[in-house]
């Protein structure tokens, strides 16, 4: 009964779709430097004391991926300052909540979406979303909201001429600096999630016109494949889909120890003592 109910749960694209959804979470946390440096345990029942490289509450989110070279260097520098400030008992500038992560049910932006910029010199222009950042609730729009910056910092020290190019800057979704485009009239709109007709999946609809805003195919791209149906399984490393869907566990009204005893042919001849609950 529990399995059949789980199969009827509607699919939620706003939770599943992300470029790094197959990236190991432990690796992502290590690149953020938000893992414990040392854990002081065995405190006679008291909770463990954790000394972090950088406390998760003090992590500074960015529109870049945590594993990019520039971000890793920034995280390493911040963790070193964080640790040295703890050792010398000095003041450390902790993170202030400049922007909070939006709830999954409120997030409606994905790579490949057609959006309209609402602020800046490109106000009123439309473009496609290149990347999204859930931690900072920002998006990058292709060719819009740009500023002139160095292509490679410190290139003159290496004997390379300094080159400049237009770099896209993040636009905040929570501050409504960018909005989705309604496919009905190609005007900016807000969107919400609602169940489709069969009731098996949530879809995006415009709050103004009620038209569905389909999710672009680029939103399904991950670092492992471009489309899920085109993924090629690696023999010897990937578990075949048939083996994953095969049902091998049969629930029993028995404890783990009793199941092992049944498999090994061990018979219990002792009489259990009465148990009292307070």
Swiss-Prot record:
Signal peptide: none annotated. It is found in: Mitochondrion. The keyword Ribonucleoprotein applies. GO terms for cellular component: mitochondrion; ribonucleoprotein complex; ribosome. Keywords: Mitochondrion, Ribonucleoprotein, Ribosomal protein, Transit peptide. Belongs to the universal ribosomal protein uL24 family. PANTHER family: MITOCHONDRIAL RIBOSOMAL PROTEIN L24. This is Large ribosomal subunit protein uL24m. The lineage of its organism: Eukaryota, Metazoa, Ecdysozoa, Nematoda, Chromadorea. The gene is mrpl-24.
